[in-house]
Amino acid sequence: MIITVLGAGSWGTTLAVLLANKGYAVSLWAHRPDFAQELARTRENVKYLPGVTFPDGLEIAQDINAAATDADVIVAAVPSQAVRETMELLAGINLDGKLMVNVAKGIELGSGKRLSEVILETLSGVDPSMVSVLYGPSHAEEVSGLQPTTVVAASSNLDTAKRVQEIFHTRMFRVYVNTDIVGVEIAGSVKNIIAIAAGIADGIGFGDNAKAAIITRGLAEISRLSAAMGGDPMTVSGLSGIGDLVVTCLSKHSRNRYVGEQIGKGRSLDDVISHMNMVAEGVLTTKAVVELSNRLGVDMPITRTVYAMLFEHKPVEDAILDLMTRDPKPEL
């Protein structure tokens, strides 16, 4: 089996290494040719995943068309807002029978589409039953360090989800399956927004009570949006929901939590982003989800509060006061 991973960030590189170590022939494609050449020369992703040497079965692809044409499985590991642009590069390729696995987490800005929908819309030759996502609490730093990790492979087709499970499953990377691809994608995307809120609480100096409230009420927002889009309410209790939400809100590795923490300390969004080496998906996902929730009539007060702080320059203290002084309402 030949697998092509599109995107040589920390997560794409981690998965490429994992798959190569399982014995698959793996090609890793980077968007920038000069970066691809550096990866081929050093046999290590010094910029995004330092200290992890590439196994012999991992090749660096210079030509995305050749790499995708030869592949049985294509893994999309580019930033969420670059999925459409990257898929358009594959438009002239015969993708019949190829398994598509998206691992980016986000909602497309403007269209409000889930990333599996973006893939299907962009690549008309792809069978919808062959599209899947791989989500869950899985920081690249820990997976590449062979620390125990559990994730979920989701597809509307159970056989496809099981195939992804078989491909990625290892002794330390346990993969479950789920056919609720809508719920899995929504949970895995919106949790990044809630993590920004959790980081803001850290930056201000709030305690455990505030963090617990953000996580719990954030989960309620995820559940409402997922239900409005046809997702199974049970999915939010799984790995892509509560699992990924907890790790993203609490972890030192979380880029989204870090962005929030810096905002809470008084830095501007532009300043924080300009000094980061990697993408914090939750920033643009916040914009996309506010637009989507407005269109669907879904109440998401934490998400809207994060939006106000990030994009409307609302003072953090004022935003939190407004959030806390809303009219009382039932919990469930």
From Swiss-Prot:
Reactions it catalyzes: sn-glycerol 3-phosphate + NAD(+) = dihydroxyacetone phosphate + NADH + H(+); sn-glycerol 3-phosphate + NADP(+) = dihydroxyacetone phosphate + NADPH + H(+)
Compartment(s): Cytoplasm
Function: Catalyzes the reduction of the glycolytic intermediate dihydroxyacetone phosphate (DHAP) to sn-glycerol 3-phosphate (G3P), the key precursor for phospholipid synthesis.
The keyword Lipid metabolism appears for this protein: yes
Residue stretches spanning the membrane: none
Single Gene Ontology MF annotation: NAD binding
Protein family membership: Belongs to the NAD-dependent glycerol-3-phosphate dehydrogenase family.
GO terms, biological process: carbohydrate metabolic process; glycerol-3-phosphate biosynthetic process; glycerol-3-phosphate catabolic process; glycerophospholipid metabolic process; phospholipid biosynthetic process
Segment forming the signal sequence: none
Entry protein name: Glycerol-3-phosphate dehydrogenase [NAD(P)+]
Annotated EC: 1.1.1.94
